[in-house]
């Protein structure tokens, strides 16, 4: 039910913005009818992670050809033969491998849970580009759909669920499974983010993100709902050949309940990160 509510809400926001844009003399995309321009328009709407689907295979126009709507995705079949008891065939999480003597033994499995389906609405207006995007996988019970991303972008603002601002998904190397490298900050979170393009090379983002805290409470503490959002910030420099360097910081407050004193407590933490990508050749 939550997935359906989010899907409906994002599409309502997207189509409402489309209706508003048409009232302010929308620039028709019919001037960019060739396939290459449409492909580029769809692909460059926002940065992609290594396993995000790119441009859609099917594109539809509205009546006035002001906006384009794409549907795409892919089917991914993964087969695994494990010797030491991996818990999940979709995610190679080394910390979940059982200790020696407690492993269930060798096993074989297949999964299509990482297959993707997405919908993207893109349009150019006199005041900026509008993007509405929904993406889902099939990792729910019995391979039912599971929401991955759902957001609207306009005038530098991103509203919805997307990759965290603290991470740099365009710098994460390709892996077969979705767990990715151990050093990667890979998480999708509900957020309100603003990205400011300083010039052709520099840009910066600031966000408020909702994070679900996960921690061990012990006997004298209990988990509670978080009272303060995460506040991540990053700044990015992009070179002429597409290589980039990014640094970021995050301020986080984690709340818990002190059972002994029957009071809610908040602890503040922070973090910094640095990342980058170097394109050795033009096809890197």
Annotate each PLM feature:
Residues 1-24:
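Bacterial Sec-dependent N-terminal signal peptides
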Residues 8, 27-29, 242, 282:
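Intrinsically disordered, low-complexity segments enriched in Ser/Pro/Gly/Ala and basic residues
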Residues 15-17, 129, 217, 221-230, ...:
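An exposure/low-complexity boundary signal
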Residues 18-81:
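N-terminal periplasmic/intermembrane-space "pro-region" immediately following the signal or transit peptide
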Residues 50-51, 94-100, 169-176, 211-217, ...:
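Flexible, solvent-exposed coil segments and beta strand-coil junctions
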Residues 62-89, 99-213, 227-228, 232-240, ...:
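Outer membrane beta-barrel
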Residues 88-94, 221-226, 262-265:
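Flexible, surface-exposed loop regions and adjacent strand-edge segments
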Residues 241-284:
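Detector for outer-membrane/organellar transmembrane beta-barrel domains
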